[in-house]
A protein has these predicted regions:
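N-terminal secretory signal peptides and thylakoid transit peptides that target proteins
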Residues: 1-15
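FMN-binding flavodoxin-like domain, especially the glycine-rich phosphate-binding loop
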Residues: 2, 29-70, 80-190
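Boundary at the C-terminal end of the N-terminal hydrophobic targeting segment
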Residues: 25-27
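Short Asp/Glu-rich motifs
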Residues: 72-74
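Hydrolase active-site cap/lid region
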Residues: 76-78
Length: 190
């Protein structure tokens, strides 16, 4: 059963969606991004939500990076573990997404921001994946820190790729998430 707060959020979201659906559908139709894929890692679900919205607006397929050993669910133990991994330069083993990179020219890559940087599972995938010649459209989700060093991390880890400007989303996005995404697609689309 939904709590009163969850119910109200759903009603407000539905009202907003119905009110803006036709104009968003028109704008989204401008972005059928051929040869584009979305690759992301999500710990809490925020980055997954944004990746799903981008996919809905672009019709791009979605591929998830999954760590072989999941991070703790609780915030503090996760931040402690991530900090230790970063200090040691440790990249966790992952279950890489089954994506044929030859099928795509543009990769929309999503990550939560962890200690000002891209998440370690994303860093693992980037370190073992040749993205030469690809266009990287990064996006990050955060809990208050904003973009931080995430775009710089993509530039550093993808030196033979073109990295566009980033989409930065607080949490899993506000009620205007679709508008934020469409604005970003217009500004960053190669």
């Amino acid at each position: 059963m939904l709590s009163k707060r969850e119910f109200l959020k759903a009603v407000v979201g539905l009202t907003t969606l119905v009110g803006t659906h036709s104009s968003l559908a028109k704008e989204a139709a401008q972005f059928p991004m051929k040869r584009t894929a979305i690759v992301y890692y999500s710990h809490s679900g925020n980055t997954r939500t944004v990746a799903s919205r981008i996919s809905a607006l672009t019709a791009a397929p979605v591929f998830e990076i999954v760590p072989q050993t999941p991070y703790p669910n609780a915030y503090r133990p996760t931040t402690k573990q991530v900090r230790e991994e970063m200090q040691k330069g440790y990249l966790p083993p992952i279950h890489a997404p089954s994506i044929n990179l030859n099928d795509f020219d543009v990769l929309i890559i999503g990550t939560p921001t962890w200690w000002h940087h891209i998440a370690r599972p994303v860093a693992s995938w980037l370190s073992q994946t040749d993205l030469s010649g690809k266009v990287i459209m990064p996006f990050n989700t955060h809990g208050g820190g904003g973009l931080m060093q995430t775009r710089d991390d993509f530039v550093q880890m993808c030196p033979k790729s073109t990295v566009t400007q980033s989409l930065t989303v607080y949490g899993n996005g506000d009620s205007d998430l679709d508008e934020q995404i469409l604005r970003w697609l217009k500004e960053a689309n190669p």
